[in-house]
């Protein structure tokens, strides 16, 4: 003779509702706390191309010589990021880039503007150790500055995207190719 043995739960509806209530409290508490805590004030700081971690930065100055100050974001450990109005400036330093032109083409994808392949026929603008390329489909401009001296194997990479991309990419180009460099 076979007997089927089943363990029946020892608690009823009240216990189930208690478990559901605890789950709602645990899952809902972060949302309530987030709503109660005010948003942090934006951090305004001077835009500096490059990276202090590598000991190489180029301070951005406006055409009138004043420091360019924008809202800085700290959400990406690989790049420094500022928002100037609705335009974004991202910068990083890469090491040992053997093909500077290819590195510049790749950086547009690398900082999150898009994963599409940039047309190889898009011309690059060169001036001494600086390069610039525009990706109009992604509304982005990438600019690089190849290092020399103690920064010989380093390259500052900058990607500018957004509605005022041309204004800020021209400003970056001016700073990396002229006396704006520090």
Report the location of each language-model feature:
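Polar low-complexity intrinsically disordered regions enriched in Ser/Thr and small residues
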Residues: 15, 24, 31, 53, ...
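C-terminal region of N-terminal signal peptides and the immediate post-cleavage residues
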Residues: 26-56
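Compositionally biased, intrinsically disordered low-complexity regions enriched in proline and serine
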Residues: 6, 55-57, 169
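Proline-anchored loop/turn motifs at beta-strand termini and strand-loop-strand connectors
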Residues: 53-74
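Hydrophobic membrane-insertion alpha-helices, especially the h-region
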Residues: 6-36
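A generic structural signal for solvent-exposed, polar alpha-helical segments
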Residues: 22-23, 62, 121
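Intrinsically disordered regions, especially transient/low-confidence alpha-helical propensity segments
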Residues: 13-14, 53, 63-65, 79, ...
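Conserved polar/disulfide-associated segments of primarily extracytoplasmic proteins
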Residues: 3, 38-44, 70-155, 161-182
